[in-house]
């Protein structure tokens, strides 16, 4: 009996062992136990059973002892137990792949019989191994794996021990069965050491890894009829891992992996070429299966339950998975490598990498285009990737169809080919290569082929991770800070969302046929990642990686390994980013200011980076529109060589961009042009990475400050969010590729008309469509077709081409704000980054031993409009200049007029804004036709009166003539539109008045008086309130009277000063506002309340008044306008004024809280009556804390280019127009809350033929031609041309304090050229005496001026060499400045005046004669004298008007009003 059983055992075991004889078997038949000793297993059989890769071969397997226990009576429910004591396996690597594995002996155990009882018993065997030692010998290293307490056993679908009958799920209808196995071990020890050799002593650092308990879960799906395995699912689960690696161990690991990479790659290609055809699950049940399962017909419910259970655990395709719950990896420097410490900037450093829930999935046999919903960790990221990959496949299918058609056309036009010329395999695959779409054209030589396009995918998921900053022994004991981390929790993102998702897919045909295949694709998703710049960590990593790369190069040279990397092969790449954050910190100083930020964070909401054109905002049409925007700017033209660019500047708009935008760089385009012979081979449609054009799109991109104590942990905005597009190409690599292409493939470049007729027609239709939709755009091509690609194929890199060309396009208006402490932080960060960059460069040179490769980069930036707000320290209100009248109190006016007047003026502003003469210095010009009076504020940005009003806005000091006129029933409606203008309409006449921007709020000389002249309709006033002799009111059908003049502060803009109408806002010019009296008022949004008109303001000086007079003068123009239709005499007007005083507190369009803040403003200026604002002191105290003096620079038409040539850097910047606005003291909270954010300002403010500001900055060795110091500190050149602006001296002083640095600034050599520039300066500094006169505004007109700064820091100021002598220029400028201090006289010989202060001809150009200069100087002197006379006369009349006004006020007081 025992002999018979031994023979049966030998029959089955002989397939696995060698030299097995019956005497080696000890068997106890009744007990069911047996024992074998010194077993030598068959290597080839084990290779087939384990399905080892062909780059690995088993050379020997030995087992010292094996025992078996068979439960004879319970074979259906209990497994056979096989125990092995110690197994030793020796393996070796193969440089060339060995023969493929044969069929598994388990599958053939029963002679290819059906799945029966014997197969179930064998399948359920439990194997236990005390110790397994695997030794692997490779060319460059030896490795060993030691596993202890290994167990292999069957489990149920929930991975639990149980009855063997529940360890399988059998579906007779499908003809398939699922079995579940689990393999676990107590410990695994991995060790790898370099091959012992005399010349490899430096690479002998052993690599060791010890893991704790782990397990593998295996799910097998077999066919019932032949027991063949259809699909396998293998999951390797590792618990927490801690691995410490020194730099030498990491080098060894990289070297070992590199030595195996070539063999692994060859083996992978072999596996793909011999991959099995994917099999479909059988839906038809065989008769034999029905015989075996007779109960299925009687139990339909049970059958349905089995089918459902089978579907729940079905393995649709083979896959392998690695799951690591937590991995801590520590990389540190070698402690014993003392010879390297002297070369390291950071010695003894260590970095910790912590990964949570790391999963790696591998799907080797996935049918291309099929659904992935059955994958193990299917998510939204997988769904997005599938949609993108399907678009790529669809494009590939279309290209294959066009390629087939091109081959047919070529064959028809050529002599008949031999039958063997056209591959039957290729012709048939016209049907098979397409995964989805329309039916294909029948092939000429059809032949069956079962090959389908397959894909191999690797998916990496990382739920959370932290890469900490480098730490050293010198640092104090503290928890390390994160350098790269995930912010899912702080952003409240779903926990199931992966921090990093990466999926790489390759395509192949199972039979290895030579047919076009798509390019591999890589999809990556980054969610809520934060990168923090740490100087020590970057320096340490840089040296670490450089050392690693250098040792790897040495290793490859020793073993003569080829660099088989496919870096030049194109890979379709897409990277999606969600809530990415880049943080640049600074050193925290003790005792810093509460407004001092500690970090700058650069963030984006959504980001897409791709080299394909199948992503939103990254398509060919988007690039075409962007190229058109750049081409519309002459600055980016190749022929533009004027300053700030030069003849050596790169050609930013490279032809690669234009060819790619019009899809002229594809393989199919070259086929149609005749440059490539159409062939159906593997690489026909593949391209090189050198042809890639990258697109990066940020839907929202913004920059914040963080870490301020005053911010209470909240970020403060620096640059408001805006969309950003970036396009990148590589001309140098493309040129090298074209050279290789021409060398390898000498193909004629002549294009046949027949081959390109379809393409030319398509492009012609595209051009006609573009011309139809954009008639004003510049033609993109010459003639009726696109530029010929033949010429571009012969393209070679020139000096005007950089290695990398970058186009940066900002699509919206950019708004920025910065205060002094934030400015200091930016200076510190700039210095730190420059120092870090220089240190990295020197480290690279030290490790490599030679200078780093010189890379050239060209970056172009296009920005339509921007706004920079300087948040300066608030001006002390008590230091503001006050007139004697203001010392005794000033009357108040309500902040708002009726809202309905705003629409009236807005329409009038649009009608008359462009046709009136532009006046810059408070010159009120009433036209002689008695129908129109206009003062243009075309340079004044928009103002929302709801947000910014000073006390002077409510300060109305009325003269006698004004009160007399109030009694007239012809008081017109007054309103203020977005440009702070005044429109008056009465009868058939209309009046449009736009105030000046140059008046000081507290100025005692800035008074305006209403005047009337007999027989004339012209009224002229200067900045000091001086006027022509008064006359009677104008009569007739024109204007009834002029009843007020706006003071400068009435026209000043608010925070953002952006109009609701972008076109009108673009036509505004710079105002000047005294910040000392500007306070912040709360305001409602424009949607809640329309813009209110500004109150009229007429101020006088040298007139002291009592408190009662001040109270009397506190009038509401809202009331006056509402009752302007009332028929009354002069006495009735006094009654109306008295009623208006009572209505001062309840202004329309204002909430109670806003009213408090509004009226509280007047107290801070020291001009308001205490009685008028006594109830509002609390609101004033609240607003005082966040007051800032704001100066806004509105920038229009920004064109920039950055050229980098190795260490040389050139920055060229061109600004079309700069418009400063001085808002004075405003509430920071209200300013930030009410300014428009991200508004698209497409209109350009007064397009100019030449930009106002051109700037060029150079640094590096190439800048030595300008100055020796320029190599280090840089050299700045700036040209300012045709620039006109206005500034208050307080604003200039405040900006000076803003720019002050805490340290001594480095000397930067520079050269500044100023030409045809006018700056109006208003001195609003406090006077030493209250009776001193306010200085008159001074206009500085600079025709030609050069300012140079040398290396020693000294400045040199000189005039242009175009002037023969400096005397004429000096005299001319002097007289011109005198004249421009008054904006009064109307020079009748020059009717077409275009500037407010221009009362004489412009200073002649240098090309004009000297005689003309003399004549102009004489005219200026005459005008100066005329202005002086007018000024004296106006002062006398002003004093008389003050006296009359004071008398009238006393009369009103006696009347009890």
Curated annotation (Swiss-Prot):
Cell compartments where the protein resides: Cytoplasm, Cytosol; Early endosome
This protein's GO CC annotations: cytosol; early endosome
The entry's keywords: Coiled coil, Cytoplasm, Endosome, Phosphoprotein
Coiled-coil regions, chain positions: 1410-1455
Domain of life where this protein originates: Eukaryota
Phosphoserine carried by residues: 414, 418, 774, 934, 1008
Domain Chorein N-terminal: 3-94
Quaternary context: Homodimer (via N-terminus). Associates with the Golgi-associated retrograde protein (GARP) complex. Interacts with GARP complex component VPS52. Interacts (via C-terminal coiled-coil domain) with STX6.
Protein name from the UniProt record: Bridge-like lipid transfer protein family member 3B
Organism: Mus musculus
